[in-house]
Amino acid sequence: MSDGQWVCLSSEEFDQLQKYSEYSSKKIKDVLAEFNEGGSLKQYDPHKPISYDVFKLFMRAYLEVDLPQPLSTNLFLAFSQKPRQETPDHPKEGASSSEPNVSDSNAESTAKADAACAPDTESKPIKTQVPSEELEAAAPWGEPNAPASSSDAPIVYLKDVVCYLSLMETGRPQDKLEFMFRLYDSDENELLDQAELDQIVSQMLHVAQYLEWDPTELRPILKEMLQGMDYNKDGFVSLEEWVSGGMTTIPLLVLLGMDDSASKGDGRHAWTLKHFKKPTYCNFCHIMLMGVRKQGLCCIYCKYAVHQRCVSNSIPGCVKTYSKAKRSGEVMQHAWVEGNSSVKCDRCHKSIKCYQSVTARHCVWCRMTFHRKCELSTACDGGELKDHILLPTSIYPVTRDRQAGKSDSGAAAKGELVMQYKIIPSPGTHPLLVLVNPKSGGRQGERILQKFHYLLNPKQVFNLDKGGPTPGLNFFQDTPDFRVLACGGDGTVGWILDCIDKANFTKHPPVAVLPLGTGNDLARCLRWGGGYEGGSLTKILKEIEQSPLVMLDRWYLEVMPREEVENGDQVPYNIMNNYFSIGVDASIAHRFHVMREKHPEKFNSRMKNKLWYFEFGTSETFAATCKKLHDHIELECDGVEVDLSNIFLEGIAILNIPSMYGGTNLWGETKKNRAVIRESRKSVTDPKELKCCVQDLSDQLLEVVGLEGAMEMGQIYTGLKSAGRRLAQCSSVTIRTKKLLPMQVDGEPWMQPPCMIKITHKNQAPMMMGPPQKSSFFSLRRKSRSKD
C-alpha cells in the first residue's frame, strides 16, 4: 500500500463525532448551500479537492463549533491520501515529478476517490498526526481555481466527506438514498455508473465498520443489491432503480437508520443490528449467529433474530399491535416466537436450552415460555405487566367519518392517510404512555426506547424526537385512567407537563419519571433517583403500579425587561417546576453550559461534570463576579420588600423543591420538634419563624434562600454546611434588577439585562412517587446518633 494509507478513527473518536453532530442544528444540505453565491464558502469549488484549512471551515459550518485538533486531524486523514506515484516501483515520497491531474482525468479521479474512501480492512488501522508544515503545503488545494500539482499535500474529496456525514444524520432512508445519488451524479444526467456506485458503497462500509458491522457479510449483500438494481444491464443505475433497490435491502435500511414509526403494528419488523451476549440461533435457518462483533439482525418488537443473508427470505411477519375492527367478546391470543429462550418452562419448570429452537417458544405479550408439549390455553392476559400494557384487542381504528374530522392537516395536505385509533383498555388496568427522549443520557435514551418497544405495545411508546409529546398525548386523548412515564431529564419532564396542560384533559394524567443523564433534581425529590443506571425496567414498571400520588406546584415565570435596555439572551422557560436563581450559582451554571455547548465530548460522565463544576466554582470564588448583589437587586415577597442591605450575598435562589445541583438541599432540613405546618400562605421573613418552616413541593409556597458565595455553595454541596441563609417563605416573588446578571430556571442558564421578574402560582400537576428507599444499617446508626 502507498503512503496514503487509510487512517481509521478510534471508536472513542467516532462516538465523539456523533455527539458533535447531535448537538448541531445544521444539516449537510444546509452547509452545501454555503458554497453557492452569497455563502460563507462561496470562494471554494466543492467539486475540487480541498485543503485541511477549508476542511476545518466546512466542519465548523456543519457542527457550529471547532473540532478538537486530534479529532479534526484524524478525520481529515480518514478521507485524504497523498497523490500516488505513476510508477509503482517508486514508493518513496516525492520520487516522481509526473503526477496525474486529479481535476482533468475522470477515470484517475475516480480511482483516487475510491482509494480515499475504501478502508483497508486487512491492515492494522493507523493513527497519524498531520505535521503543521504538511498542512500548510496542502493550502493551494483549497484555492478556488487552484490547479493540481505534484505536491505531497493530502487530498480530500468533499463528496466523500458529505456522503459519510449524511449517513450519520437522522432522517428517512429514502431521503438519504436520493441525497447520495444526487451527490455523486456530478453530470446531473440522472444516472450513476459503476465507479460512482462503488464510491457510495465504500462510504457505507466505512460507517458500518465504526458501527461494529462485519463488512465481510455486508459487502456481498451490497454487491448483490447493485447487480439487482441495473435491470436492463447497461451498466448504469437510474434514481428510481437506486431508491427502489435500496428500500428493499433490509441490512442497508438498518445502516441508513430504518424509520420504525410507520411499521408499528402493520406486521413489518423493525430491525436493528445486535451483538448477542449468549448463544443465539437464526429463527429462519436455525444456524447459530456467529461473529465477534454484531452477529445478526434482531426485531426490536418481537426479538425475531436472523442472519443478514436470511432477512430477505420469506420470514414470518411481526406481531400486530391493534385489531382491524372492534369485536365484542374478542379474546386475546398468544403471539408466539420460536427459540432463543434460555429460561425455564412456565408449566413443567424444566430448563429450556437455547438450541431447542423448534421445541420451545415464548409469547411476545405476556412473556410466558413453554415447551411445545407443555402449552396450555391459547388465551393471553398480558402477563405481569398487564396493568400497563395495551393489548392489540384494546386498540382498533375509528370509522372513516370520525377520522376525517380529526385528520392531521399537515399530513392531509401531503395526501397521506392518517389513521386514528380508539382505545378501550381492559377493565381495572392503567395503560402507560411512555415518552422517551433519545438524546438524554448520551445513547441511554435510544436503548431505553428499544427496550420499552419490546416490553409494552410499540404503539404506546413514543420517541420525543418525532413530534414531541403531542402525538402520544393525542393517541391517549380519550383513554380513561392512563398514566405517563417521562424518560429523560428535568427539562423533558417540564416539556411533557406543558404539553399536558395544553391538551386540556378532563383528568390530568399522573406522571412518573425515569431519570436519564445527570442532575435530575425533580426525579430525586420524587424518589426515582438521580439517574437510571441499567436496572430492570420490568421492576420499575411494577413499582409504578404501586406508586402514591403527590401534587407538584408549578409557577409562572414572567420576565419583563426595561424598554431602554438592549435585548439579552432568550429566557429558556416561562414555567418553573424546580427552582429559579440569580447570581453566583447561575454564573457557574452559565459557564458550564457555554463550555458544554462548545466541547460536548468533555461532559460525557457524571464525574467529569462534577470536576468541571468544581473548576468553575473555584474560579468564581476568586473572580466574585456577583459580589454586593444587594446593590443591584430589589426583592419582594408577597408585596413585602425584604431588606438585603445588611446581608452580603452573591446569589439568591427561589425554591419549589428540596433539591438543587443534583441533590443539594439549600433550604436545609427542619427538625421535627420545630416543624410547623402552616395553614396560611402569608409571607414569613422573621429568622426565628423561618427555622420552623417546612419545605413541601405541594404547599403552594416558595422558599427564598441567600448564598454568600461560591465557597458556601461548595460547602453545602459537600455536606460541610447544612444549608444557605433562609430569607423568606411566600406565595409570590418579585425581583427588580439594575444590571446584567446571570440567571437560571430549572438548570437552564442565561444572561439577563435589567428587568423585573414575577413568580406566581400556576397550577398543580399529579406526580407519581417512587418507592421509599430501604434503610441500611449505617443510615440507621446515623439517625440514632442525630437523635442523641
From Swiss-Prot:
Its EC number is 2.7.1.107. Residues 95-109 have a biased composition (Polar residues). One of its GO terms (cellular component) is plasma membrane. Ca(2+) 2 binds at D230, N232, D234, E241. Expressed specifically in brain. Highly expressed in cerebellar Purkinje cells (at protein level). Keywords: ATP-binding, Calcium, Cytoplasm, Cytoskeleton, Kinase, Lipid metabolism, Membrane, Metal-binding, Nucleotide-binding, Repeat, Transferase, Zinc, Zinc-finger. Residues 83-93 have a biased composition (Basic and acidic residues). The activity is calcium-dependent. Requires phosphatidylserine for maximal activity. PROSITE patterns: DAGK, EF_HAND_1, EF_HAND_2, ZF_DAG_PE_1, ZF_DAG_PE_2. Coiled coil: none annotated. It catalyses: a 1,2-diacyl-sn-glycerol + ATP = a 1,2-diacyl-sn-glycero-3-phosphate + ADP + H(+); 1,2-didecanoyl-sn-glycerol + ATP = 1,2-didecanoyl-sn-glycero-3-phosphate + ADP + H(+); 1,2-di-(9Z-octadecenoyl)-sn-glycerol + ATP = 1,2-di-(9Z-octadecenoyl)-sn-glycero-3-phosphate + ADP + H(+); 1-octadecanoyl-2-(9Z,12Z)-octadecadienoyl-sn-glycerol + ATP = 1-octadecanoyl-2-(9Z,12Z-octadecadienoyl)-sn-glycero-3-phosphate + ADP + H(+). This is Diacylglycerol kinase gamma. It comes from Rattus norvegicus (Rat).
